[in-house]
């Protein structure tokens, strides 16, 4: 599963997930993409589950790019522990998703296969998504 090799600090503030994605909002590596329409957090496990579903459907035909990385640690206190005594330990990693962010890209397959594969992958994700393709001018 994806997670940073090392970070400057072990824990992060919760923060707020506002605005829309301006960077990473266009299909830039592949031919087709899966773009987030809603906002939320995608865990490293969900990202991997969706990747497996997509790659299982395209088999050896296409190439897949993951355009997001879970770089935010989410901490959690153990079960049945009283409040206080500091912040809990990092439990898992998430990527914050804003509307417009391209999550996955694919090339080397037909549009029909790409749509089916991304539909299978999107079912594993907690955000609403849309299928997009690269617009070629001319």
UniProtKB/Swiss-Prot annotation:
Gene3D superfamilies: Ribosomal protein L10e/L16
Region (Disordered): 1-22
Bias-annotated ranges (Basic residues): 1-17
CDD domains linked to this entry: Ribosomal_L16_L10e (cd01433)
Entries under PROSITE patterns matching the protein: RIBOSOMAL_L16_1 (PS00586), RIBOSOMAL_L16_2 (PS00701)
GO molecular function: rRNA binding; structural constituent of ribosome; tRNA binding
Gene Ontology BP annotations: translation
PANTHER family xrefs: 50S/60S RIBOSOMAL PROTEIN L16 (PTHR12220), LARGE RIBOSOMAL SUBUNIT PROTEIN UL16M (PTHR12220:SF13)
HAMAP family the UniProt entry points to: Ribosomal_uL16
Subunit description: Part of the 50S ribosomal subunit.
Family: Belongs to the universal ribosomal protein uL16 family.
Protein's name according to its UniProt entry: Large ribosomal subunit protein uL16
Species annotation: Acidithiobacillus ferrooxidans (strain ATCC 23270 / DSM 14882 / CIP 104768 / NCIMB 8455) (Ferrobacillus ferrooxidans (strain ATCC 23270))
Gene assigned in the entry: rplP
């Amino acid at each position: 599963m994806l997670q940073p090799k090392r970070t400057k600090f072990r824990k992060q503030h919760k923060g707020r997930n506002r605005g829309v994605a301006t960077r990473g909002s266009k299909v830039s590596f592949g031919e087709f993409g899966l773009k987030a329409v809603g906002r939320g957090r995608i865990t490293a496990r969900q990202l991997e589950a969706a990747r497996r579903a997509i790659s299982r459907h395209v088999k050896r035909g296409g190439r897949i790019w993951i355009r997001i990385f879970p770089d935010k640690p989410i901490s959690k206190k153990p079960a049945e522990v009283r409040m206080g005594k500091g912040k809990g330990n990092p439990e898992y990693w998430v990527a914050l998703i804003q509307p417009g962010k391209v999550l996955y890209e694919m090339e080397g397959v037909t549009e029909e296969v790409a749509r089916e594969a991304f539909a299978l992958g999107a079912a594993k994700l907690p955000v609403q998504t849309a299928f997009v393709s690269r617009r070629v001018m001319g």
